[in-house]
From Swiss-Prot:
The lineage of its organism: Viruses, Viruses incertae sedis, Naldaviricetes, Lefavirales, Baculoviridae. The gene is LEF-11. Belongs to the baculoviridae LEF-11 family. This is Late expression factor 11. Involved in late/very late gene activation. The keyword Hydrolase does not apply. Keywords: Transcription, Transcription regulation. One of its GO terms (biological process) is regulation of DNA-templated transcription. It comes from Spodoptera exigua nuclear polyhedrosis virus (strain US) (SeMNPV). The keyword Transcription regulation applies. It comes from the Viruses.
């Protein structure tokens, strides 16, 4: 089952609530683009094997987050610079002469 960015952000909110409940409040207010957010990421990675997201509807089911660690890492390493994002996108097509000719 596909893991959406909304699923990950919902899990982050639950992680923050869990850390508050456990009185682990160090950098609990850090935003995803701040360096201190790394504490949330470390907590999530340490507990990823136990992480589930319940998806509702008439036939509720659970998504295991451990299967989606690559996607989660990608979301937590979002590119915040337009220039860096452009370079990353272009680098996907290095060696693709046809794509290069179309973009110039």
């Amino acid at each position: 089952m596909c893991l959406t960015r909304s699923d990950v952000y919902a899990y982050v909110r639950e992680t923050i609530n869990k850390r508050k409940h456990e009185v682990d409040v160090s950098n609990v207010l850090a935003h995803i683009f701040e360096f201190d957010f790394q504490e949330h990421v470390e907590y999530i990675r340490a507990n990823i094997d136990k992480a589930l997201i319940t998806v509702g509807g008439e036939q509720p089911y659970c998504k295991r987050l451990s299967y989606h660690i690559k996607r989660i890492n990608k979301i937590f390493n979002l590119i915040t610079s337009l220039e860096t994002e452009y370079k990353a996108a272009v680098s996907k097509y290095d060696g693709d002469k046809h794509h290069y000719e179309r973009s110039n």
